[in-house]
From Swiss-Prot:
Limits of the KH-like domain: 373-457
Organism whose genome encodes this protein: Helicobacter acinonychis (strain Sheeba)
Listed GO MF terms: GTP binding; ribosome binding
Cited InterPro entries: G_ENGA, GTP-bd, GTPase_Der, KH_dom-like, KH_dom-like_a/b, P-loop_NTPase, Small_GTP-bd
Subunit: Associates with the 50S ribosomal subunit.
Record's protein name: GTPase Der
Entry's family note: Belongs to the TRAFAC class TrmE-Era-EngA-EngB-Septin-like GTPase superfamily. EngA (Der) GTPase family.
GO biological process, one term: ribosome biogenesis
């Protein structure tokens, strides 16, 4: 336990791999600093950050997960235990969707002996129904635990209050923020339009190895920032470059090429983790496809990254000057294989001949405007009402299904809630119909639309 005279309090985030430590670190720091992924042992180093919690500056430490089979596990565990001893408070994070293991309990008790100033933080409790899962963690022997969901921003404010109380810091109220309303929005993206800071459009360039991503970055920025080579996998770390188009800043990130999992070895695995991090903070993805040869299955799998991260998307058909087939055949194949991206604009290009490069820049701005669009509530409800009248909602076991009203609660990407009497009865096919209707009425070029249904009673209670 830390007994030094310094005034800056230190908080260490500990726990097994892949339980959400880095995500919690990012949430508390209000930045995406630590790499977060599904790989065990993603965080290899200590991430240290001075942050402000309700007006108080503290030091936050995110440490590597301590699994027996993890890389450098003994060294990481020893370093973690030392961090626990030196910290003023420990946040021990567990996965609320998993059953606690004997190893996890043993590790927690070992840390608790070193420093009893310890909170048990049960992550991934995404809604009230999942709270009962937290009872399984009573075996840790903590009289009080904290149920949170980092991805849904639930329970974070209560945890922060408890942290400040444990550290002997008085809460400073900076603004009148309705925390309850913020936490009731069960979505990781709660972006509002009222940000006065200058927005930089973040664009991730994705694709298989050697399809021309680095060449595209070079011609877009007119710089030789990326090494261009015929050797697959030349780009390891994401390389970023900012340009100005129509007084709008655009930051391009050239990510490592993606190949089949069976071929991913050593540093390429690290590169993929960095690619995931780059996409997490991107607004738009440029999916680069090599048309000098037919599309492959991996192209389709990579395209799903844009959907996974809810990004705007533009399809770039590179090496058009040496395309393998006529225009009509390539476009027909593209439409068939990438049917779920039919809303994405398509641009043919040749980096060697700088074909359509300026068009790509202007299309990015157009897609970003759609990505940031907010539909006036009255207009949105008018369109939804007309759509449900034209094609009524299917009944639910013979009972009438109604949409009372719709509201757009977020942008980047646009997210819409339908307040209904029977939200579970909203079939995915009808949701797709509503999305297509909105696309026809409003220009959502290259932009994913997210629609969810909420029960009227729960909305009224909230």
């Amino acid at each position: 336990m830390n007994t030094s005279p310094r005034t800056l309090k230190t908080i260490a985030i500990l726990g097994q791999p892949n339980v959400g430590k880095s995500s919690l670190f990012n949430r508390l720091a209000k930045e995406r600093i630590a790499i977060t992924s599904d790989f065990v042992g993603t965080t290899r180093d200590i991430n240290k950050r001075k942050i402000t919690l309700n007006g108080h500056e503290v030091e936050l430490l995110d440490t590597g997960g301590m699994a027996k089979d993890a890389f450098l596990s003994k060294e990481i565990k020893a370093f973690n235990l030392k961090a626990a001893q030196m910290s003023d408070l420990i946040l021990y994070v567990v996965d609320g969707k998993s059953i606690p293991s004997d190893e996890d309990i043993k590790l927690f008790r070992e840390i608790f002996k070193i420093n009893p100033n310890c909170f048990l933080v049960i992550n991934k409790i995404d809604n009230d129904k999942e709270k009962e899962r937290s009872y399984a963690f009573s075996s840790f022997g903590m009289p009080k635990s904290f149920n949170i969901s980092v991805s849904h921003n639930r329970g974070i404010s209560a945890l922060i209050d408890a942290i400040l109380d444990a550290l002997g810091l008085t809460k400073i109220i900076e603004q009148d923020l309705d925390i309850d309303i913020l936490e009731s929005l069960e979505t990781p993206n709660n972006t509002e339009d009222g940000n006065n800071e200058e927005e930089i459009i973040q664009v991730g360039i994705i694709g298989r190895v050697n399809v021309g991503k680095s060449s595209l970055l070079n011609v877009l920025t007119q710089k030789e920032r990326s090494i261009v080579s015929s050797v697959a996998g030349t780009t390891i770390d994401p390389i970023d470059e900012t340009i100005l188009v129509k007084n709008q800043k655009i930051c391009f990130v050239d990510t490592a090429g993606i190949r089949h999992k069976g071929k991913i070895l050593g540093i390429e695995k690290y590169a993929l983790e960095r690619t995931q991090k780059a996409l997490e903070k991107s607004h738009i993805a440029l999916l680069v496809l090599d048309v000098s040869a037919p599309f492959v299955e991996l192209d389709e799998k990579i395209s799903s990254l844009a959907d996974k991260h809810s990004l705007g998307i533009i399809l770039i058909l590179n090496k058009w000057d040496i395309r393998y087939a006529p225009y009509e055949e390539i476009m027909a194949t593209l439409k068939r294989k990438f049917r779920f991206l039919e809303y994405a604009p398509v641009i043919t290009t040749s980096c060697l001949k700088t074909r359509h490069i300026e068009e790509i820049k202007h299309k990015i701005i157009e897609v970003y405007e759609c990505f940031s669009k907010r539909i006036p509530t009255s207009l949105l409800n008018s369109v939804i009402s007309q759509a449900t009248q034209k094609h009524p909602l299917p009944s639910d076991g013979g009972k009438l299904v109604k949409v009372y009203y719709a509201t757009q609660f977020a942008t980047k990407p646009p997210q819409i809630s339908l307040v209904m009497n029977r939200p579970k009865a909203l079939h995915f096919s009808y949701k797709r119909y509503l999305i297509n209707t909105l696309r026809k009425e409003f220009n959502f070029l290259g932009t994913p639309l997210i629609i969810n249904a909420k029960d009227k009673k729960s909305v009224q209670q909230n």
